[in-house]
Amino acid sequence: MNLIIILVWHSMKHSKGYVLEAQDDELSR
């Protein structure tokens, strides 16, 4: 089990979700 890879994957996943939400907010404006 590579905990570092899992942590990086989760961080990337969350960062992408944050970016998508930010784009949606800009489009809704």
Swiss-Prot record:
Record's note on what induces expression: Identified when cells are grown in rich medium (at protein level).
Gene transcribed to yield this protein: ypeD
Note: Overlaps downstream mntH.
Organism: Escherichia coli (strain K12)
Name assigned to this protein: Protein YpeD
Pfam families, A to Z: YpeD-like
